[in-house]
Amino acid sequence: VSGENLYLWKNYNGFDPDFVIMIAIAKVADDKFRKDMFKSKRKPIDEIWNGEHHREIGKIVRFTPSACNTQPWKVTAEEKSLTVYRYKKSGKRGIMPADKVAHYNRIDIGIFLCFLDLCLMENRIGFERELFTDNTKDDCEEVLTAKYTLL
């Protein structure tokens, strides 16, 4: 697809032509991957997962990659639901310039939702997901992103 055709297609289908991101997920050779993912530096489970339900999911999904290295997600877990928030701790911006953090945190939360879906499916937990639009300014600490009803 030529650049001009892609631009026209994106505009026709309602995509902002300046905002495109893609993530590839694939199985890689064992010798190309981290030997022990639990040795990587991530936020502790209690910092991102509120509640005692489904912690086995939280213990894995907390390893979701983060562009800003801020891991901007919080989950409130109940027996039959998960509520996901984009979380921005005041003064924390990771490796990104301050004016780019909100943009990349929105991308990070999308990647997190993908990993959360995959973890739920791997554990054979059925779900329905409701997504919420994030049009907030950068001054909000928690923004409702998704609600999962667990089946």
Describe the predicted segments one by one:
Residues 1-151:
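Acidic, surface-exposed loops and disordered segments
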